[in-house]
C-alpha cells in the first residue's frame, strides 16, 4: 500500500475505468510520517535495504487514500498485520493475528469485505502449511509471488502471478508471459497444494 499505488489509480487507472486489487499491511497504513514509513519499509518490507536507501516515494497510503480507492471501485486485499515472513511464525495465535485479525480490522475501518490475501515476500519459503490453512479458511483467493499460469492445477489454493517491472525489456516480459519460467516455480506450487491434502 504505497502512496504511489494510489496516485497510479487516480491518474492512470481511474480515467480508463480499470480496476485493481491493492494489498495492504495494517501496521503500515497506521504510520503517520514519511520518516517512520521509510524505517518501516527498511525493517519490514525490504529488510535488505538501509533506511537511507529506501526511496522517498516509498511511504504509505492512509485510511483516507484507501477509502478513496474503494469509492472508485477498486478492491482492497489483505497483506498481513506487519509484513512478517509467515514461515518464521510458529505460534498459531500470532499467525492468526497476522492473517485474520488484521484483516477484520481493515474490513471494519473501511466497511468492506476482504476476499483476497497475498502473503508477504511471495515465495514458498516465506509461507507455511499453518499459514495456508488459516488463509484458506478466511479468504476466497490467496496470491503468491510465484510466476506461472493457474490453468494446469485442480486446486488453485495459491495463485501464481507474473509481476512486471518497468525496467524489464519487452523480450523479458514476453518470455514471462509465454510461460518460459513457469517450470522453475511449478515444484513450489505443487508443494503448497499438497499442504492442503
What residue ranges belong to the model's regions?
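Metal-dependent polysaccharide deacetylase catalytic core of the NodB/CE4 family, i.e.
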Residues: 3, 14-125, 156-159
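C-terminal active-site subregion of NodB/CE4 polysaccharide deacetylases
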Residues: 3-4, 15, 88-197
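Active-site-adjacent structural elements in enzyme catalytic domains
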Residues: 11
Amino acid at each position: 500500500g504505497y502512496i504511489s499505488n494510489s496516485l497510479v489509480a487516480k491518474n492512470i487507472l481511474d480515467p480508463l475505468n480499470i480496476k485493481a486489487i491493492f494489498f495492504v499491511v495494517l501496521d503500515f497504513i497506521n504510520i503517520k510520517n514519511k520518516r517512520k514509513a521509510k524505517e518501516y519499509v527498511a525493517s519490514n518490507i525490504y529488510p535488505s535495504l538501509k533506511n537511507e536507501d529506501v526511496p522517498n516515494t516509498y511511504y504509505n497510503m492512509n485510511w483516507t487514500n484507501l477509502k478513496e480507492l474503494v469509492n472508485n471501485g477498486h478492491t482492497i486485499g489483505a497483506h498481513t498485520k506487519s509484513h512478517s515472513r509467515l514461515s518464521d511464525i510458529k505460534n498459531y495465535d500470532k499467525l492468526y493475528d497476522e492473517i485474520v485479525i488484521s484483516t477484520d480490522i481493515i474490513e471494519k475501518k473501511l466497511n468492506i469485505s476482504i476476499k483476497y490475501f497475498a502473503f508477504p515476500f511471495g515465495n514458498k519459503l516465506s509461507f507455511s502449511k499453518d499459514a495456508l490453512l488459516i488463509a484458506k479458511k478466511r479468504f476466497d483467493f490467496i496470491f503468491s509471488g510465484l510466476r506461472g499460469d493457474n490453468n494446469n492445477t485442480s486446486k488453485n489454493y495459491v495463485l501464481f502471478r507474473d509481476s512486471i517491472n518497468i525496467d524489464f525489456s519487452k523480450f523479458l516480459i514476453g518470455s514471462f508471459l509465454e510461460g518460459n519460467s513457469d517450470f522453475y516455480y511449478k515444484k513450489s506450487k505443487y508443494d503448497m497444494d499438497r499442504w492442503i491434502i
